[in-house]
Structure formats: C-alpha cells, structure tokens
Amino acid sequence: MSTNDNWYIEHFQPTGSAIGFRISGKLDEVQSPFQKIEIYQTTDWGKLMLIDGAVMLTSRDNFFYHEMISHPALFTHPAPKRVVIIGGGDCGTLREVLKHPGVESATQCDIDEQVTRMSEKYFPELCDANHDARAELLFDDGVAYMANCPAGSVDIVIVDSTDPVGPAEGLFNKAFYESCFKALKDEGILVQQSESPLALLDLINEMRTEMGKAGFQSFKTLPFPQPCYPTGWWSVTMASKQANADFAFRQADAQAKGFDTLYYTAHLHTGVLVAPPFVAKALGE
C-alpha cells in the first residue's frame, strides 16, 4: 500500500493490480493488540477503514458485502432463529441479520473490540442494531467460541472475516469448519466471505474442500460486485449439511420482505444462483 498525492493505493500482488481512493485527511489510527486500524476521509467514497493496510470498507459501497453475506443465507434457511456471526466487528452484517423479524438471537464474536469501537464512532449507520435486545456482542476468539458452541444449537453461522492471514487465519481450515458443522442444526447453513472469484478461484476451491472434509455436503458460491476490494468482484460461499442441496430460497418471503435493501432483491438472488460459466467450471458446479 502507499499514500501519496492525496491518494491511498492498495496494491494487490496476485493480479498485479491496485485500487485507489482520493483522500482528504486521516481521521484516526489505533493499534490494537491484534492489528492496526485506520480511518480516512475520502473525497467521493465517504469514510474508509483499513486494517493492517488493507481496505475493509467504505461508506459508499459496504452495502453490497453486508447484504450478500446475510440475506441469501437467511432466506435459504427455512426458519432461521439463532444466528452466530464470527468476525463482523464493523457490525454491518449484524444490522442486516436483525432486519429479519424471525431471528430471535444473533451473537457477534469478533476478536478485536477496537474494530467495533471505531465503527461505532465513524460508521454509526452500520451499528443501528448493536442495542437490539436480540443482539449479543462478544469480543473473543471466534475459533474458541465455535469449538465450545453446543451441538445443534445454531441455524446459521456467518464467517465475516478478513483475509485468511493474521487473526483470521484459523477461520479457513478443517478444524474450524468441524466446529461449525457440530454447532449447526441439520438444516443449518454456514456462509463465509470467499474472496474474489476472478482472481482467487483456487482459494475458493480450497475452502470448499476443507468444508467438505469437515462434513458439509453441498456448496454454492455467490459472486457480487464490491468496488472497494481487489478486482471489484467478491463472493460468499454457502455450505449445507444436506447432500445435493439446491439452495432454493423462500422466494415469496424475499419478495415480500418488510425492510429496505440497496442491492439484494429476490430477483437478484435467483440470478446469482447461476454461476458464470468460468466460475462454474472451476468449482465443478
């Protein structure tokens, strides 16, 4: 990464590319016990959060990610009541989950409290649900939390993590997925951010392989635009305990949802279930 001439530029080595934002000033910086968190004011994208020099979110486009890691899984499950979010310290995913009135509890477990405190200060619009009676915010190791989660107690596990390095490295392996598998009920769904399908299909395949080793039987990777991330195209991957799951969703409920979204719709959900040919071929779909 580099900062020069009022631009913040993140270099992405796997594709020999970069993404940049014009900035008007640095608002804050905190070194937590786990990582460095920085907040910048941009000229066109609102506020920008970096973690260890990598772009995490902007005010302008975070809705793509937060909606797609939440609503497809919640509308795919027949009746989700208990949701666990591992990571998600900016609280945007928690906000989207708790838009669903049928959800009775949502526990967010992020290892770094400072991410949440910075989000509350600089991205308060993401933290609307933090004081919802159904919300529980924990600041602990997500790997340990899932290992100790009672068997068959959770409907959906959302892994809203940073890239598979540093504090998030343990969230991308068989042992962690085994804990998720154990905690989920029979109709439960695991959903995890799965990087760029344009640049990192090998990593997505590795994730799905590790999930399969842990017992998951069916997988579906959903691509979506994410302008602030490398390549501008991102994905989430859903995993089911059920063999040959088709990931059909409650289309009527999605069409009649009683809350606003900026990107997710029932029609979009239908379309995103059909992977582009090069993605389908690489993932064996």
Curated annotation (Swiss-Prot):
Name the UniProt record assigns to this protein: Polyamine aminopropyltransferase
Domain of life: Bacteria
Domain PABS: 5-241
Main location as per UniProt: cytoplasm
Positions annotated to bind spermidine: H66, D90, D160, S161, T162, D163
Residues annotated as catalytic: D160 (proton acceptor)
GO cellular component, as recorded: cytosol
Organism annotation: Xanthomonas euvesicatoria pv. vesicatoria (strain 85-10)
Pathway(s) annotated for this protein in UniProt: Amine and polyamine biosynthesis; spermidine biosynthesis; spermidine from putrescine: step 1/1
UniProt-listed GO biological process terms: spermidine biosynthetic process
NCBIfam families named in the record: PRK00811.1 (NF002010), speE (TIGR00417)
PANTHER family cross-referenced by the UniProt entry: SPERMIDINE SYNTHASE (PTHR11558:SF11), SPERMIDINE/SPERMINE SYNTHASE (PTHR11558)
InterPro entries, sorted: PABS, PABS_CS, SAM-dependent_MTases_sf, Spermi_synthase, Spermidine_synt_N, Spermidine_synt_N_sf
Family of the protein in this entry: Belongs to the spermidine/spermine synthase family.
SUPFAM superfamilies (UniProt xref): S-adenosyl-L-methionine-dependent methyltransferases
Keyword ATP-binding: no
Binding site for S-methyl-5'-thioadenosine: Q35, D110, D141, G142, P167
UniProt entry tagged with the keyword Lipid biosynthesis: no
Record-listed E.C. numbers: 2.5.1.16
Reaction catalyzed: S-adenosyl 3-(methylsulfanyl)propylamine + putrescine = S-methyl-5'-thioadenosine + spermidine + H(+)
Assembly and interaction partners: Homodimer or homotetramer.
Role of this protein: Catalyzes the irreversible transfer of a propylamine group from the amino donor S-adenosylmethioninamine (decarboxy-AdoMet) to putrescine (1,4-diaminobutane) to yield spermidine.
A single GO molecular function term of this UniProt record: spermidine synthase activity
